[in-house]
């Protein structure tokens, strides 16, 4: 089965090139880094990567005079369709490299949490983080510490995957959530032990994998450890024939609170002048179809209410503003005006990395992607003690959604009419106590579940 997949990946190589070209044309690829999709670029011995310090032309390792430069000869290992290369043991011991693969934004936040906490226990470990999307790349590039570097994940083809692994020679691989690239995982397991952490399978993917159960098992047998995020996910893995997975809970509970620039927060809070902010976070077009029609009604009822919208993909800002005009709404983007125009109907935040700032001033936050995309991360808003609302589709975050609802830490709505009804109810002054209770319960829910991090670290560090 795997050989068939490899053969298809060769045959479909021209299609991969076309897909990358299309993604480039529609702005989903970074032309400055397009070569990384083909494993061309940086590598473990790159002179420009001071964080590894294993290159033969370095005079010494910074901060540690006991580790002097030595010239190493790569060891060639012939396997199957090609060769892999490894550093001799004494070289790889100098700086162990953990490779973390994070598909998109949510997984990238988990990667940052792992890096921060693993490096506390093992300060000499260095990190390579791969991801697929432009949005995750921007966040990781901005937030990664000096002990880590980001690269785009190459196309899942044996040529590019083996080249990537030769370039980086990781000592441990950690895949987050549901990134199951067959070639990458199969070849990666030849280089180092692989862990699948915070693993989950959406209901849609589960149905698809049931038709390909043997292939699913073939991929997952390459993982030395599989840690799932819920009992439901554990059941799914078991039904797919993976019997050695364990459930430690959702590591997103351990993600650090989103950063906030305090100077910007003071300026924004002063500017908003005690207005009650309703934030629509990580929205998609399907969310905006529901949200935009109710804004006028909301603003007319509550003069002290201000609407802020943060699209999941900021590059959509022009189309959102056009949609606002079609609904007779006035809107300004942050790229146009650094502070909200209070006379407008809404303010659109089209910059990455500022979600924490706007959660800080929000009273109520609607979590986007919850009408058709399976929902985004509820917990980020909970850290800021927001009253949380989400739509009917939380299929990608089923257990967290169930947990917050059971603890009266969030509200689920069915449609646009229901959303308007709930917002109207919460914003009425005589319901202020109930609004405060939801906000307090959201923060308590986070704090009650944070012990999960230590359990994950205890498992992961056994492989270091």
Curated annotation (Swiss-Prot):
It is found in: Cell inner membrane. SUPFAM superfamilies: UDP-Glycosyltransferase/glycogen phosphorylase. GO terms for cellular component: plasma membrane. Its main location: membrane. GO terms for molecular function: Kdo transferase activity. It catalyses: lipid IVA (E. coli) + CMP-3-deoxy-beta-D-manno-octulosonate = alpha-Kdo-(2->6)-lipid IVA (E. coli) + CMP + H(+). Residues 47-93 form the RPE1 insert domain. The lineage of its organism: Bacteria, Pseudomonadati, Pseudomonadota, Alphaproteobacteria, Rickettsiales. The record marks 177, 252 as: Transition state stabilizer. The keyword Transmembrane helix applies. Disulfide bonds: none annotated. Its EC number is 2.4.99.12. Keywords: Cell inner membrane, Cell membrane, Lipopolysaccharide biosynthesis, Membrane, Signal-anchor, Transferase, Transmembrane, Transmembrane helix. The active site is at residue 107. This is 3-deoxy-D-manno-octulosonic acid transferase.
């Amino acid at each position: 089965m795997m050989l068939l997949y490899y053969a298809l990946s060769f045959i479909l190589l021209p299609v991969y090139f076309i897909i990358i070209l299309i993604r480039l044309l529609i702005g989903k690829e970074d032309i400055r880094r397009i070569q990384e999709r083909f494993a061309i670029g940086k590598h473990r011995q790159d002179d420009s990567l001071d964080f590894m310090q294993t290159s033969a032309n370095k005079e010494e390792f910074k901060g540690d005079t006991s580790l002097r430069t030595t010239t190493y000869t790569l060891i060639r290992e012939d396997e199957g369709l090609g060769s892999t290369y490894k550093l001799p043991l004494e070289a790889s011991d100098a700086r162990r490299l953990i490779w973390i693969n994070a598909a998109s934004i949510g997984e990238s936040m988990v990667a940052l949490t792992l890096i921060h906490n693993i490096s506390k226990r093992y300060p000499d470990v260095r990190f390579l983080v791969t991801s697929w999307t432009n949005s995750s790349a921007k966040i990781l590039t901005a937030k990664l510490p000096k002990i880590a570097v980001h690269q785009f994940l190459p196309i899942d083809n044996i040529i590019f995957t083996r080249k990537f692994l030769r370039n980086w020679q990781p000592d441990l691989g950690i895949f987050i959530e549901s990134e199951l690239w067959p070639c990458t995982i199969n070849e990666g397991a030849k280089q180092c032990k692989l862990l699948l952490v915070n693993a989950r399978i959406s209901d849609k993917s589960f149905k698809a994998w049931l038709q390909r159960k043997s292939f699913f098992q073939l991929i997952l047998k390459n993982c030395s450890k599989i840690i799932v995020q819920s009992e439901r996910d554990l059941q799914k893995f078991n039904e797919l024939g993976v019997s050695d997975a364990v459930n430690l809970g959702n590591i997103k509970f351990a993600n650090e609170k989103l950063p906030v620039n305090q100077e910007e927060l003071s300026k924004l809070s002063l500017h908003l002048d005690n207005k009650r902010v309703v934030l629509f976070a990580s929205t998609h077009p399907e969310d905006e179809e529901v949200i935009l029609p109710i804004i006028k009604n909301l603003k007319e009822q509550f003069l002290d209410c201000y609407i802020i919208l943060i699209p999941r993909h900021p590059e959509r800002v022009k189309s959102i503003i056009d949609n606002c005009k079609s609904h007779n709404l006035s809107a300004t983007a942050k790229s146009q005006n650094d502070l909200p125009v209070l006379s407008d109907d809404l303010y659109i935040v089209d910059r990455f990395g500022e979600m924490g700032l706007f959660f800080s001033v929000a009273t109520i936050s609607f979590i986007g992607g919850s009408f058709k995309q399976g929902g985004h991360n509820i917990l980020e808003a909970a850290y800021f003690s927001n009253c949380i609302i989400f739509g009917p589709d939380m299929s990608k975050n089923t257990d967290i959604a169930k947990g917050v609802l059971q603890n009266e830490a969030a509200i689920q709505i069915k449609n646009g009419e229901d959303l308007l009804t709930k917002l109207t109810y919460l914003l009425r002054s005589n319901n202020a106590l109930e609004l405060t209770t939801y906000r307090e319960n959201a923060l308590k829910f986070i704090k009650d579940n944070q012990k999960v991090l230590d359990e994950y670290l205890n498992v992961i560090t056994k492989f270091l």
